[in-house]
UniProtKB/Swiss-Prot annotation:
Region of interest: Disordered: 460-488
Reported function: GTPase that plays an essential role in the late steps of ribosome biogenesis.
Chain positions recorded as GTP 2 binding sites: 205-212, 252-256, 317-320
Residues that coordinate or bind GTP 1: 9-16, 56-60, 118-121
Protein name per Swiss-Prot or TrEMBL: GTPase Der
Pfam family, one: MMR_HSR1
Chain ranges of the KH-like domain: 373-457
Oligomeric form and interacting partners: Associates with the 50S ribosomal subunit.
Source taxonomy: Bacteria, Pseudomonadati, Pseudomonadota, Gammaproteobacteria, Alteromonadales
Family under the similarity heading: Belongs to the TRAFAC class TrmE-Era-EngA-EngB-Septin-like GTPase superfamily. EngA (Der) GTPase family.
Positions with biased composition (Basic residues): 473-488
Organism: Shewanella baltica (strain OS185)
Gene3D superfamilies given in the database record: 3.30.300.20, P-loop containing nucleotide triphosphate hydrolases
Presence of the UniProt keyword Transmembrane helix in the record: no
Annotated GO MF terms: GTP binding; ribosome binding
Length: 488
């Protein structure tokens, strides 16, 4: 299970600075999808051998009113659901009443908390940090987030005990960043393994769009094999089921209601729960409320799915009972705001009455099959060559970028690794052209495609040419001849 780290503290103590530093390697993953709104409060990070979700709980001001009343409900929920809390303070400003108030709240929650004294650069850090021991939360860790000092050590201190307790294996940098090159036999075995596994389907959406209604509709129609077990507030419910001979695991982020409680319309929304579900899923089913249109929160959830590279199906719920004018407006808005994910199927359904629900599975299976389809190296290389023939790569410093060959680099999402010269200088416009070319040629539906470009190292770079024995003798005679002329 991927751990969750919550950054807590009053404003201007450096939470956003630390958040940006921790998530910088993941922040550009959705750059190829212009128009997408990203939620800057939640991110995925990898540091010191650990992959984790980091949450910036902005909005906690530390006042009594803020702690006791509605003060940033989502931030408080994030604290409750976090595995580790980093309580950030400002070493330059010293201990404040707001710090004391936040510390009191954290002590009452009995969360695993580490006190971080930030902004220690250029001051006597030991003296400045001494007063923070009075918070009663244990050792005080020094950090300068803007410069990166102490960040890696802090994550090690914070996550190692949790990882050991949960049996999480610490990874090396190369294990995460290395791009696996499959042989034909390995690719076939990996594809068969994925095809034999149940499809993990995460049903996500903002509050009250009908996630529970749809889940119960699916389970009611398909006779659930193992009915829902009570889950904790932070864990989604995993429900195995079978439909037309194919096995599924439904990941329900809303919590399946027993039939006596299906009428409830209020549900607790958890971004962290949704993030975890998306990370673990093969296919994401995003539900949008037809009567409210596309909200910023919908785009944020869409960003989570695209960040993770998951196959995607969109369901516009509550389609029944609205007049044709509203339907036309919703379809126009979908075309305008979701044009950048034209690979995803969109369905118009009524979870309450079951209209269109059965057709969802056709698109879910289609998306999963596209995401796990094996394509040979020869086929990928041929498509790459065809894309060059139709539209040549640009010139860089007077030389044409040369693409040599392509191969599969992974599944779910499909990854195509392209090797060549100067490929790092290819403009984004040409990369998007190639991505769309591969998608059309492979007839990929319901899943994004990732392209990765690798340059081959020049074996003669930084190496001097080795002379033969006769060349070496001639060089020495020439040197001695020049030396004799200089002495005369």
């Amino acid at each position: 299970m991927i751990p969750v780290v919550a950054l807590v503290g009053r404003p201007n103590v450096g939470k956003s600075t630390l958040f940006n530093r921790l998530t910088r390697t993941r922040d550009a993953l959705v750059a190829d999808f212009p128009g997408l709104t990203r939620d800057r409060k939640y991110g995925r990070a990898f540091l010191s051998g650990y992959e984790f979700i980091v949450v910036d709980t902005g909005g906690i001001d530390g006042t009594e009113e803020g702690i006791e009343t509605k003060m940033a409900e989502q931030s408080l929920a994030a604290i409750e659901e976090a595995d580790v809390v980093l309580f950030m303070t400002d070493a330059r400003a010293g201990l404040t009443a707001a710090d004391l108030s936040i510390a009191q709240h954290l002590r009452s929650r009995e969360k695993t908390t580490f006190v971080v004294a930030n902004k220690v650069d250029g001051i006597d850090a030991d003296s400045a940090c001494a007063e923070f021991w009075s918070l009663g939360l244990g050792e005080v860790y020094q950090m300068a987030a803007s410069q990166g000092r102490g960040v890696t050590n802090m994550i090690e201190y914070a996550l190692t005990p949790y990882a050991e307790a949960m049996g999480i294996v610490r990874q090396g940098e190369d294990e995460v960043t290395e791009e696996r090159e499959y042989t034909e036999e390995e690719a076939e075995a990996e594809q068969k393994r994925l095809q034999d596994l149940p499809i993990k389907l995460a049903i996500i959406g903002k509050p009250n769009v009908g996630k529970s209604t749809l889940t119960n509709r699916i389970l009611g129609e398909e006779r659930v094999v193992v009915f829902d077990e009570p889950g904790t507030t932070r864990d989604s419910i995993y429900i195995p089921m079978e439909r037309e001979g194919r096995e599924y695991v439904i990941i329900d982020t809303a919590g399946v209601r027993r039939r006596s409680k299906v009428h409830q319309v209020i549900e607790k929304f958890s971004v962290i729960k949704t993030l975890k579900a998306v990370e673990d899923a093969n296919v994401v089913l995003l539900i949008i409320d037809a009567r409210e249109g596309i909200a910023e929160q919908d785009l944020g959830l869409l960003g989570f799915a695209l960040n993770a590279g998951r196959a995607l199906v969109i369901a516009v719920n509550k389609w029944d009972g609205i007049d044709q004018g509203i339907k036309d407006r919703v379809k126009s808005e979908l075309d305008r705001r979701l044009g950048f994910i034209d690979f995803a199927r969109i369905h118009f359904i009524s979870a309450l009455h079951g209209t269109g629900v059965g057709h969802l599975f056709e698109s879910i299976e289609e998306a999963y099959d596209s995401a796990t389809r094996r394509v040979s190296t020869s086929m990928l290389t041929r498509i790459m060559q065809m894309s060059q023939d139709d539209h040549q790569p640009p010139l860089v410093n007077g030389r044409r970028v040369k693409l040599k060959y392509a191969h599969a680099g992974g599944y779910n999402p499909p990854i195509v690794v392209i090797h060549g010269n100067q490929v790092s200088r290819l403009p984004d416009s040409y990369k998007r052209y190639m991505m769309n070319y591969f998608r059309r040629s492979l007839k990929v539906v319901g899943t994004p495609i990732q392209l990765r470009f690798q340059e081959g190292d020049n074996p003669f770079e930084n190496k001097t040419e080795k002379l033969t024995m006769s060349q070496e003798r001639r060089r020495k005679r020439a040197q001695s001849h020049i030396k004799d002329r200089k002495t005369k």
